[in-house]
Design a protein with these regions (language model features):
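Alpha-helical scaffold domains
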Residues: 1-226
Length: 226
């Protein structure tokens, strides 16, 4: 066991490990140490200041799920954009579950919208489930507000995948787009631009959203594919 692993096990909550394993199918239960996210997030902020941090970021693959979660949190703290992209591209092929994928939210992305868009297009075309999911999530996080352009909706709309975690992200994206950019997003539903499952899941998630008006929800119900 490495010195870092010893420190991680010192934060272990075995009940949480069992709970997390149930939420993350496909990852062996023995891979979970069981560290709660707020605890790991606090640790990550301190660990970035240590010399061991850089060494850890180059040690792939990791043995434990919690090490992958830590890796994602550390990438999110990287302040140099080029370095952040390099580390992200190196790590993504090793991401094997939705939780590690979704924990990555690099703050530096917000300052590099133009360069980031090109990377998002590349990630979204990936055949690797979680690289594709990460790309769509980054688009959702950074381009549905003041930096929005209607053409960006084509990026997730053009994704062709039977993978559950990709399809879920496309539906999540379009439900969010309906909440934030209704006029530009609704034609994708009206014109059945998405595959049936993603179409109906988008409607379901939008109807569950407090950001969609009752009138919009009523209209969306009429657009379900039977």
């Amino acid at each position: 066991m490495t010195s870092l692993q010893e420190r991680l096990f010192a934060m272990q909550d075995k009940q949480y490990a069992a709970f997390q394993a149930k939420l993350t199918p496909g990852v062996p239960i023995e891979s979970f140490i069981g560290i709660r996210v707020p605890v790991l997030r606090k640790f990550a902020k301190e660990f970035t200041k240590e010399t061991e941090c850089e060494e850890f970021l180059h040690q792939l693959p990791h043995e434990y799920y919690d090490e992958n979660m830590l890796h994602g949190l550390l990438i999110s703290e990287v302040k140099d954009y080029e370095e952040c992209i390099r580390l992200t591209d190196r790590f993504l092929p090793f991401v094997d579950n939705w939780a590690v994928c979704d924990i990555m939210s690099p703050k530096v992305f917000a300052k590099h919208k133009e360069e980031l868009l090109a990377k998002i297009k590349t990630w979204s075309k990936s055949s690797h489930v979680y690289t594709c999911r990460f790309g769509i999530e980054a688009l959702m996080s950074h381009y549905l507000d003041k930096d929005f352009k209607a053409e960006y909706l084509e990026i997730p709309a053009s994704v062709r995948s039977e993978e559950y975690y990709v399809k879920m992200m496309v539906a999540w994206f379009f439900a969010t787009a309906l909440a934030k950019q209704w006029d530009q997003a609704i034609p994708y539903i009206e014109q059945n631009r998405l595959a049936s499952w993603m179409h109906n899941k988008t409607i379901q998630k939008a109807i569950e959203s407090y950001r969609i008006t009752p009138e919009q929800k009523e209209y969306l119900r009429t657009l379900k594919i039977k």
